[in-house]
């Protein structure tokens, strides 16, 4: 084979290989269409999974905050309150987080002269709201100097977008916490009376 024929043959093979490596516009459109269909099918599942995760994970955030407040009250021999609020003040909005603070006069607000903040537990809720329903009609939880709730037994209710995402953290008269059960395993959690709770 002569050198000129070899160069010509190599050049034609190079051109042939170059065209085989590319993708056509039709192939790109098909791939984009398939990806769009998969995303459309997966989005409801992902959102449902995230809502369920938020509802189930809430107990792991709330229970330690309540236990810390209870032990702080007993160890320091002072009243400790928990309210819904930011890291610096009680707003009454539990979605902002749980603010734990020493509450000398049991009024549920931070008095700068006597009270100080112990901790703030951010909740970062995206799919539901958190509501405190307690005895005595208070908007906050108070642990007395002995570590027992002061008329504050009740529940922190998480109200999701659908009833299957509703959850509750129950605070007993002794200051213990437990999560709401699903006794009949129907996917709907019940209140302390065994009825599905409604937000």
Residue ranges and their predicted role:
Residues 2-14, 41-67, 71, 75, ...:
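N-terminal helix-rich module
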Residues 29-45:
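Alpha-helical hydrophobic helix detector
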